[in-house]
Amino acid sequence: LLKKIHIQGFKSIKDAEIELSQLTVLIGANGAGKSNFISFFRFLQQSITGNLQNYIARSGGAEAILYYGLKATKEMSVTLTFKGSSYDARFEVTTDGSLFFTKEGAHGFTTCYKQPWDISLLGSRSNRLESGIDDDIKKFRENFKKEGITEEVKKNLSSWRVYHFHDTSDSSAMKQPVAINDNAFLHFNAGNIASFLFLLQQTEKNYYDNIVRSVRLAAPFFDNFILRKDPFGSETIRLEWKEIGSEKIFPASALSDGTLRFICLSTLLLQPSKLMPSIIIIDEPELGLHPYAITLLAGLLKKASSEKQVIVSTQSVPLVNQFLPEDLLVVAKQSSATVFNRLDISELTQWLNEYALGDLWEKNIIGGRPSK
C-alpha cells in the first residue's frame, strides 16, 4: 500500500504531501492538476525502470516537467511512503536540459532479521542518469542472503500501471491483431485485450466468465467473445464477439466506443489478483459510458480496491455519487499551484442526509469546481 506521496517541483505541483487510501477518487476542475498527478506515476515508473532519459526526451525536456519550467524550478524531489518501506529521490537539470538523480534512497525494516535498512542507491557516485535500484538490489541480496526482501521497494515502485482507454478509433491498438502470447499483463491502452482475454479464457475460466457477465449487464445484446488464433496461420489474435440470438461474428469495430471501453474496464478490474498491478491508476474511466454502466463501473472499482490499491480521476457526478466522502481527494489550484485536500466528513453529515456526494460536488459544497 502506498500510504503517502510527497512531490516537489513536478509540473503544476509545487509542493504537496498527499495521503492515499485503498481507493482514492480524484475530483477537480479542468486544469486543477489531476492529470499532472496521474502523469507523475508514469514519470516515476519510467525513472525506476531505467527509462528516465527517454521519458524526459519524449516529454519535451526538463522545461516541460519542472514546475513553471527551468526559470522557476531547479530541482524536483519525491518521497514515497509504503507500508514497511519508503523511497526518496531528487532530480536536477543536466546541461542539455534533461534530468538526473542527485539523490536516491530506499528505507525499510526486514522482519526476518529484525533490523532496519537505510541505503543510498547512488553508491559511490554523487549523481547518475538512471536509477540505481537494480544495482543496490544485488548488493542488498549479498548482505542479507535472502531473496524477496531485497526487491520490496522496486516491486512497489515498478508494478503499478496507469491505464487510459480513451482511444477507440479505427486505428486504436485494441482493435488491431496482437501476438497471441502477448498476455503477461493488460497493456495501458488495452492494446492486447484479445490475447489477455484469451489467456483468461484458457487458464482462469471463472474470472473470464465474470468479465462476460459484467459486459452483459452493461450491454444486454452481448453474448460472448470469439477468441481464436488467426485462421490464416499467423500467431495473432483479434477481438471478436457474438450477439445474443445470432451466429454472426462481429469485429471490435462493431462495438460502440462506450461498450468497448467497458469491456476493457471489466477485464482490468475483474482479472485475477495475481495478474493485477500493485496499484491500478485510471484516468477518467467514465468516458463514453451511459449512466447505468457508470454505476456498474463504481462497483468494479470498489471490488478491485479490495484486492489492490486503486487511484481514479473523474469528471463524472454520477460516478462520484457512488463513493464515500473518505474516498475523495479534491484537487484545486491555489496561488498557481496544485493542492490536494481530503474532505472533513464531520462538516458534511447534515448535507449528506439530503444530497448525494456528487451533487454536493456539483453545487461546489466540497470544492473541486471552477473558481474565479
Write out the residue ranges for each language-model feature.
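Electropositive, glycine-dotted interaction segments
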Residues: 83-218, 226
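Phosphate-binding glycine-rich loops of NTP-binding sites
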Residues: 21-59, 189, 262-268, 316
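GG-anchored amphipathic helix commonly corresponding to the ABC/SMC/Rad50 NBD signature/C-loop
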Residues: 236-238, 243-247, 251-282, 292-294
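Conserved P-loop NTP-binding catalytic core
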Residues: 39-100
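Phosphate-binding P-loop
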Residues: 15-21, 272-275
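N-terminal pre-Walker A segment at the start of P-loop NTPase domains
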Residues: 1-14
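C-terminal lobe/lid and adjacent interdomain/linker elements of RecA-like ASCE P-loop ATPase modules
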Residues: 1, 295-372
